[in-house]
Amino acid sequence: MNKKLIILGSGGYGRTVHDIAEQLGYSITVLDDTDKEHPLASFERYIDDDTEFIPAFGNNEFRLQWIHRIEEAGGKLATLVHPTAYVSPKAQVSTGCVILPGSIVNTGSKVGKGCIINLGATVDHDVVIEDGVHLCVRCIVKGENRISHFEKI
């Protein structure tokens, strides 16, 4: 069965998420308020056992609000890891995260819900990244650090 993904948002980040999801073999539907046939508010009609959701908004707080809304409605969140990214088997990545090309999440690190680990970002060992964080392009987080929720670095 084909994996189904609902992407919420069609801006720059939404298009980036779409590219990654295609490479991972998802069948994709995009919801956005600019599309009268597929507005964001229609997300509940897509909830089923075979469908995952990813809110693709650059605004950290708005993205996490949508994560909570999807969970409260009974939807499942995806976690997307680009094939060229490295996530240690001893790291933990929560739901709703997107790990973009060339990124590294090293051993013992924990990534909270709804985080963006952008192109080429490096998360060294034993880092704690709280919910809703965006690590920007080529960001480096040294080992044993903590990044507070909603931070953009």
Which residues make up each language-model segment?
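Residue-level detector of anion-binding/catalytic polar loops
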Residues: 27, 76, 122
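Generic non-transmembrane alpha-helix signal with a bias for helix starts/N-cap capping motifs
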Residues: 14, 63, 126-127
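Short, glycine/charged-enriched secondary-structure capping and boundary segments
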Residues: 21-22, 67-70, 94, 112-113
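Structural signal for interior beta-strand "rungs" in well-ordered beta-sheet cores
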Residues: 80-153
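Hydrophobic, well-ordered beta-alpha structural blocks that scaffold small-molecule cofactor pockets
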Residues: 1-46
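Phosphate-bearing ligand-interacting subdomains
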Residues: 18, 35-86
